[in-house]
Design a protein with these regions (language model features):
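Alpha-helical subdomain
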Residues: 21-30, 34, 82-89, 137
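Active-site PLP attachment segment
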Residues: 32-75, 79
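Catalytic PLP-binding core of fold-type I/II PLP enzymes
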Residues: 1-26, 39
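PLP-dependent enzyme catalytic core of the Aspartate aminotransferase-like
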Residues: 132-136, 158-203
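Conserved PLP-binding catalytic core of the aspartate aminotransferase-like
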Residues: 111-169
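Structural signature of PLP-dependent enzymes
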Residues: 77-96, 102-131
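Hydrophobic beta-strand scaffold residues
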Residues: 13, 43, 173-174
Length: 203
């Protein structure tokens, strides 16, 4: 277990928590953090509201430090204040105010959670459609392993050469690691997308 190993080695966990709600649910996605904190007294958590609130242009997020004691909390707070002062001093408040307004109103919070659930279900459906369409290309390409993944992105297994070929021959852009933005898939273009991938896989 990672959380236990981190504790045994005296490491300070730094958790990138950018996509809460897109995996299995708001609470469910936070289980990994809860597990780490059950085994560790301290942790740094970096979370973002840019994705799950649709605020990409605002870059809204936070860094939280879970301290083992009050002295550690005070020391970290003083260092964070210095970093803030050196980097941006006073951040724009527009995006943060939007998040605060939504989370401060139960009706808006409920609506946001519902919309987030709809997006999560849409992503899941697109992933399933992709797997089915790849299977139905008639070329025996099995991508069922993607069904074990969740969230906005999936690692396709495509290598850098195949990714470059997708770009050059089919005008399809994905990152060099083969990571696909599932949320960016379109149901109406799935067959074309899968056909291009099948062609690339066959070399």
């Amino acid at each position: 277990m990672i959380a236990k190993t981190v504790s045994e080695r005296g490491l300070l966990p730094l958790i990138d928590f950018a996509y809460q709600g897109f995996g299995h649910g708001l609470s469910e996605d936070a289980e990994s953090i809860k597990t780490i904190l059950r085994h560790n007294d301290e942790a740094i958590i970096c979370n973002s509201f840019s994705k799950n609130f649709g605020l990409y242009g605002e870059r809204v997020g936070a860094v939280s430090f879970v301290a083992g004691n009050s002295d550690a909390a005070t020391a970290v707070q003083s260092q964070l204040k210095k970093l803030v002062r050196c980097n941006y001093s006073n951040p724009p408040r527009h995006g943060g105010s939007i998040v605060a307004t939504i989370l401060g109103c139960s009706e808006l919070t409920q609506k946001w959670e519902s919309e987030l659930a709809n997006m999560r279900n849409r992503i899941k459906a697109l992933r399933e459609q992709f797997v089915t369409t790849m299977k139905n290309t008639g070329k025996g390409h099995d991508f069922t392993f993607l069904l074990n993944q969740s969230g906005m992105f999936s690692f396709s297994g495509l290598n850098k050469m195949q990714v470059d070929q997708l770009k050059a021959d089919h005008g399809i852009y994905i990152v060099g690691s083969g990571r696909i933005n599932v949320a960016g898939m379109q149901e109406s273009k799935m067959e074309k997308f899968c056909s291009a991938i099948a062609t690339v896989l066959e070399g």
